[in-house]
Amino acid sequence: MKPLFPRRFLIASAAAVMVLTACGGIDPVVPEAAFTLQLLHVSDADGSDSTALNSVANLSGLVQKFRAQYPQQTLTVSSGDNYIPGPRFNAAYDPSLRALLGKEEVGRADMAFLNALGIQASAIGNHELDLGTRQFASIIKPDGAWGGARFPYLSYNVDFSADSEVAGLKLANGGNAAEQAGKLTGWTVVHVGSQKIGVIAASSPVFANITSPGGLVFKPAMASGEVDVNGLAAEIQRGVDEITAAGINKVVLLAHMQSLTIEKALASRLKNVDIIVAGGSNTLLSDANDVLRAGDKSAGDYPYQTQDAAGQPTVVVNVDADYKYLGRFMAPFDAKGVLIPQRFDSQLSGAWATSETDDSAGGVTVSGLVSQVRDAIKAVLKAKDGNVFGKTAEFLEGRRAAVRNEETNFGNLTADANLWYARLLDPTVQISLKNGGGIRSEIGEVLAMPGATTAAVLTAPKANAEANRLAGEISQLAVETSLKFNNKLWVFDVTATQLKTLLEHGVAVLGSQGRFPQVGGMSFSYDPARTAQTLDANFAVTTAGERIRSLKVGTDVVVQNGVVVGNAQRTFRMVTLNFLAEGTSTAAGGGDGYPFPATANFVNLVNLETAMNAATAGGAASTSTALLGSEQDAFMKYMKSQFGSTAFGVKDTPPAQDLRIQNLSQRSDTVLN
């Protein structure tokens, strides 16, 4: 990390900040900063539970340290995805958390972290809505001894009025953030010393397809598979204009777009937005003075500087997820509220790395509540890491950049587990389809030595002596972490034509998309240079896809040279996730935009939760801790049955060697050979 006591701190106090920012050989015609805002920001605590829990205490100390240096100049925000369903999230329901939370309930430990960090406003991320608006409301609003969020959640481009769970939490735009704890609004005012800062947020319209937003309406609506950036900018601009009309000349946008490309595009399309805090993409921006964690690589400059639609300076900032970094931007404004780029200070601003091994690293004093809640959650999780289901001798590749772009050994393994599980009840099931976005983390270790210039070493899970778990053993905690959503499994028939359409959708939009397929019982090739399938707002095909070149189910050739061969109406029995099949309450098709038919039209549908209960787990060979008929149950039982004594031993391969999913820009087509 950057040293906490750079030379300028040894000779200066917070009161001298404007004098200091004038130093360093700056052209004398550059105006002095009339006000310098210290913006502290976090987001995306949605990846590794271990990383987040081991980092949050040290981050709390950094926040307190920096806030104490500039107590009348600091704004602390999050750009969303502050939690995600999974072990850490669920552990807050344990009665041992009652004394700390007031009332135990899932997700509330994460909210307690944010409260202790002093977050003053947050964007709504997609993961806030993964369990629906009722659960979201349960986390942010008071409930008996539970105090709820101590800050407002913001999203200007969301209409909350049609959702009964959260409509009552919505306040008019433009109130005082300090008086809006546990409420929802489009934009708010944060009083920072003598200054008023307008804070507005926006949530990606794609949320309607990738999470469970209930009756929430996102603007502009998704008319295709792409976000209408111009329409989104126009929507946000209306809110920004409201802020400036109220006499506020400093504006921060919390943009949870899941794509830094979109956030950069918004920067040049909007007027009077000074700072955009990006969210959802886990992108690490940094400057030359930042010392990154071992193995991490910068994705660009902190801050990203450009001009807005009126030619005024604006910036985009973002840091990596899971409390690994605290973003800190010292924003010098002139008397008119315009940023002064010549006075940006890269020694103070940037990505400040936290420590996973030393809570007080850098001489900071951590928040007592953060460390207490952290320790209580870790105690709950520790018990789960000793409950073992199978073994692996290899790193199971479940990282976002892999499972959303290519076949991986973990993608194959969990797809195979679902297929094996479905066949316990129905031996005629032939194929398994799931989305890469449903795999939330790897199972194994990523080892990188400080200062290393070579790739990190990937290994099977290391031993945990505290939990009495041996190296290579796969625990309940690992399964719950990597398959956090624990979707239910459905079985039904699809035709040859429908199967090609589904796979065309999976590869229609590339580049770390949650829709990217992981499959079992079949193999296919695709050419990303060919025409992509497009869908209308009702998920009907408007442009036929030409990317799927070969497809084989067992020995049955389904697609050859891009064309369905044989009887196009012949059927294949498929197991898939209920999320993909039935989607969300606001999407006409399936989750991640999959063009499944409406539930009533599924042929020979079997819900494995119901079927497994009726058959007393279908004769599965072991007992798991997960819901019957779920993907966690399938994976635990499959691993115990197939790899309980002999470890799984298939290494992950690069795209050029992948066999189930062959990317023809990386290799030749051997699917039908």
Task: For every predicted segment, state its role.
Residues 2-11:
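Bacterial N-terminal signal peptides that target proteins for export
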Residues 3, 25-28, 514, 594:
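Compositionally biased, intrinsically disordered/low-complexity regions enriched for serine, proline
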Residues 14:
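Non-catalytic nucleic-acid-binding interfaces of large nucleic-acid enzymes and RNP effectors
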Residues 19-22:
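C-terminal motif of bacterial Sec signal peptides marking the signal peptidase cleavage site
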Residues 24-25, 483:
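A short acidic-Thr-Gly-centered motif at the start of a beta-strand
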Residues 25-349, 493:
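Acidic, metal/ion-coordinating pockets
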Residues 32-38, 42, 47-49, 53-56, ...:
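Catalytic centers of hydrolytic enzymes
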